[in-house]
Amino acid sequence: MALAVLSGDPMSSKPLVDKYREAAFKAGHPPENVKVAVTGHMFISKTNEQAIQEFYPYHSNYWSHVHSYHGIDEPLTKEDFERASGKETALFVGSSQQIIEKIMHQYELFGHQRFLAQIDIGGMPFKKAAENIERLAAEVAPVIRKETGKSSE
């Protein structure tokens, strides 16, 4: 199962993951074969405040595009974006430490085997996306692997 947790409280997705595992076990699948991946929008900067400032224009642009397909003509306000970037929310925006905490919080909820970061959204320049990938690889991934007992393979 690949679970896109893009907004709101990640806890709201837990019943879906629980049902998926329950159905798989009832169908006879061994627990080690019942995999869960979590995916979400991510932006890492030196501080939480800097990440919010830098990522807001791209995330707002992304949602404006998505909303246009559904006939919604409401822009994402900075205040809404700041709330969506809070500690207990799904959006992975902040310092490396905050990203680690959010991934680990969701790991405790879902017990997922894989996390997929959606970085290049909303017209973000390549240089910004590359910087985020580098921070993810150097500052976040090693800690997550250590905390979850996973190897880099």
Where are the model-predicted features located?
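Active-site-adjacent structural elements that line small-molecule/cofactor binding pockets in enzymes
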Residues: 1-153
